[in-house]
Amino acid sequence: LQAVAVFKQLPEAAALAAANKRVQNLLKKADAALGEVNESLLQQDEEKALYAAAQGLQPKIAAAVAEGNFRTALSELASVKPQVDAFFDGVMVMAEDAAVKQNRLNLLNRLAEQMNAVADIALLGE
């Protein structure tokens, strides 16, 4: 909890909270159960980059959390801000193609799970 309080003072905290809020708002619109990301359905460079970043985060966050180093885990999450921003700027999540739309929601859900495995990211924005 102390690490979260310290991290909350950093500029990255607000960015992480904003990204989390945006992700959560989109996930509320999911009309099917969320599952695994299908790499073959990733079409745009921005979604491929976010997927790669999310893949890379998994072991780093797991290791940091296992060591009780939540500040490092939060910093790792904040490090993907450029990919998250590019994704939201360049990708229409609610695509007409249902499979592509579902896959994009799956990707965002994976990111949300990683964010909230560390702490309740929504609290960083308060």
UniProtKB/Swiss-Prot annotation:
InterPro entries: DALR_anticod-bd, Gly-tRNA-synth_heterodimer. GO terms for biological process: arginyl-tRNA aminoacylation; glycyl-tRNA aminoacylation. Keywords: Aminoacyl-tRNA synthetase, ATP-binding, Cytoplasm, Ligase, Nucleotide-binding, Protein biosynthesis. Coiled coil: none annotated. One of its GO terms (molecular function) is arginine-tRNA ligase activity. It is an enzyme of class 6 (ligase). Its main location: cytoplasm. It catalyses: tRNA(Gly) + glycine + ATP = glycyl-tRNA(Gly) + AMP + diphosphate. Signal peptide: none annotated. One of its GO terms (cellular component) is cytosol. It is found in: Cytoplasm. Its EC number is 6.1.1.14. Belongs to the class-II aminoacyl-tRNA synthetase family. Tetramer of two alpha and two beta subunits. This is Glycine--tRNA ligase beta subunit. It comes from Neisseria gonorrhoeae.
